[in-house]
Amino acid sequence: MLLTRKSTSTGASSSRLVSTLARGVSRAVPTMDRRAFLRRSGMGVGAGIAVSQLTLVKKAEATTPARAGMTGTGKIEVKRTVCGHCSVGCAVDAVVENGVWVRQEAVFDSPINLGAHCAKGAALREHGHGEFRLRYPMKLVNGKYERITWDTALAEISTKMLDLRKASGPDSVYVIGSSKHNNEQAYLLRKWVSFWGSNNCDHQARICHSTTVAGVANTWGYGAMTNSYNDMQNSKCALYIGSNAAEAHPVSLLHMLHAKEAGCKMIVVDPRFTRTAARADEFIRLRSGSDIPFLFGMLYHIFKNGWEDTKYINDRVYGMDKVKEEVMAKWTPDKVEEACGVPEARVYMAAEMMAKNRPSTIVWCMGQTQHTTGNAVVRASCILQLVLGNVGVSGGGTNIFRGHDNVQGATDVGPNPDSLPGYYG
């Protein structure tokens, strides 16, 4: 059949475009079936819509400095700083125009982030210039916040605190510090609380890595990460137990991926299959809270097969004979499997990979520390590294991923209720 369009009473077509298409179709295909008719009709309608929209399209004009409210003569500076989110410490170049932080770039020559940014770091500027940023003192009056001056705020707060101390004593006030404070701020806060006459102060480390500080310090004298993020590229094997670095410390995993390119083996031990586990060579699922049985199960196989570093232990470690005695007597493979649900073959595999690929490192975060047995879990991890002779060597050690950007420094000198700055007392 032919595709034609009915004319109006004057004989003229109501659409020149459709008439042109109809004549073309009739010349090219004198007859067509129903399917071809529907297909070609759709093409014609689409072409008509496209042509009708041409007059609505307009080239955008370039925004001039005057139109944008700028003169183009602003002073631009680049300030080198450090990301304030997690403990990785990625370097950031902040671009500042007329004193305002306008944009940022990751630092490519930084040995830590190597020009990389995670989603948290990319949003760092919003901490200073976000719409919800508090820029001045506010006071709640009749259910609404009103702006007040700094002098008024300091005077009212000071008066109220002195009244509280007079009525109820200095311990009536509890001061919460911060792991976001720099060392100087944390130190001054601790001193201020002491001058106030109280010891009621603390910060995020209490529910973060305070168990790490105590556990590591009680094992070899100081409670801190022994190596560094970029040193992990020298590791031959890495055991992640209690850490989901891919999400909590994304840039840190960059160094492990570089290490894997060089042949490093990666083991992830976790109750959940995480994004970190997705990058591992081996994933071992254990029962939540059973880290100690698993680690001691690894020690059992290390001692049984003679994989321990005997010279290192004799030269540098005290009391390992008692640890070995307890492990061999109490943490046999059947007891370990009963406690943590991991078959003997999987525990053996993890122990063998760590022992035969040295230097090997162990990584943990709050998957270990946020337990009532956090100190003991941390000590078990440290003992494993001492047995293998991995402490004090490049590519080994305990890589403890802290939660906040200065939680280590704030813990060292800041508002801990159980010690003075520098862990005195």
Predicted regions mapped to residue ranges:
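Conserved short loop/turn motifs at secondary-structure junctions
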Residues: 174-181, 338-342, 365-372, 404
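A glycine-rich, hydrophobic/aromatic-adjacent loop/helix-cap motif
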Residues: 354-425
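P-loop NTPase catalytic nucleotide-binding module
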Residues: 289, 293-361
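N-terminal export/assembly segments and adjacent metallocofactor-ligating motifs
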Residues: 2-305, 316, 323, 343
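Short amphipathic alpha-helical segments at helix boundaries and their inter-helical linkers
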Residues: 52, 162-167, 349-368
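Flexible glycine/proline-enriched surface loops and loop-helix/loop-strand junctions
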Residues: 238, 279-280, 331-335, 363-368
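Flexible, glycine/charged-enriched surface loops at secondary-structure junctions
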Residues: 168-172, 308-313, 361, 392-399
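Active-site phosphate/pyrophosphate- and oxyanion-stabilizing loops and adjacent acidic/basic residues
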Residues: 190, 334, 352, 382-385
